[in-house]
Amino acid sequence: MPSPDGRLSHDLLPGEKGPRDACGVFGVWAPGEEVAKLTYFGLYALQHRGQESAGIAVGNGSQIVVCKDMGLVAQVFDEATLNSLRGHIAVGHCRYSTSGSSVWENAQPTFKSTSTGSIALAHNGNLVNAGELAAAVARLRGAAPAAPSISNPASSDTDLVTELLAGQPDRSMEAAALDVLPTLAGAFSFVFMDEETLYAARDPQGFRPLVLGRLERGWVVASETAALDIVGASLVREVEPGEFLAIDEHGLRTRRFAEARPAGCIFEYVYLARPDTTISGRSVHAARKEMGRTLAREAPVTADLVIPTPESGTPAAIGFAEESGTPYGQGLVKNSYVGRTFIQPSQTIRQLGIRLKLNPLRGVIEGKRLVVV
């Protein structure tokens, strides 16, 4: 494994910290396709979900290679790098941290080797029983101190899951997953792989979105339907809460590891998801527009102009204007070269980002009573 200055990684590093809550995950199983490039474009479509780091793991049936680094997807990967990642299966990740350092060591996918193979895992979510999982890893390490799958101590929720899945080399990955998944508490949408098979799982509440798509010669799993659109995959369905998927040369297999208790995060509709994404059969754009209409009915005001805070606020502002009969207009100019300010890792950076990102059209708004959505 090279130093953090390099890009290729074949193991976890000590000291990896921090849950990942609003990240983007993407996986593809497609023999004969350029899976690294499909994953690159899928992550590009999910870039809004995380801008700190990006990574892709590719398997060719005999080994897994992981490439990850700090930065945006287009900064981490170039044509030469993508051309070097050959295989029939891939998983990718773009990271936003809810806590912990924004450093190379925390980039995903995570990776672990075992005596029978390897696993690469990408996680969108935040587990709340990390202490229990750490104890399980410690017991596993104590029971098999020489096992090749147990090397560095795990220090984040994602690392712990990777350790637990990789720590049972005498069992199949499917069997290990169906044993581990019911022990997890919190939010998780996983996309992971061994050398031959693509796996996906979603927590029983379905906190974070996860969808299944079909290519002409394969399958895709992604955080949002917009990523399926970009790579030319057709939507099959959502991965159900409490469902586990396995995809290989024998096709698609599904198992339920927990009873579904749907409780999706409303912030996906409000901010996190792309407006051209569909969640639970409903357009995010339409949902935001209806939120604006509802706001106008429940909190009516007299105003001269309705303006959005671009981009997430635009559909809601349009809905408010249409419902209230108040004129709609642009009052804030967005700098398209500044990333999403809410998901920056510190409050100081967020405040600087807002000043860089938005500037008022003074001639439009000066002296007017405004509704800012």
Cite the ranges covered by each PLM segment.
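Conserved short alpha-helical segments that host acidic/polar catalytic motifs at enzyme active sites
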Residues: 1-241, 246-303, 309
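Amphipathic alpha-helical
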Residues: 160-172, 310, 321-340
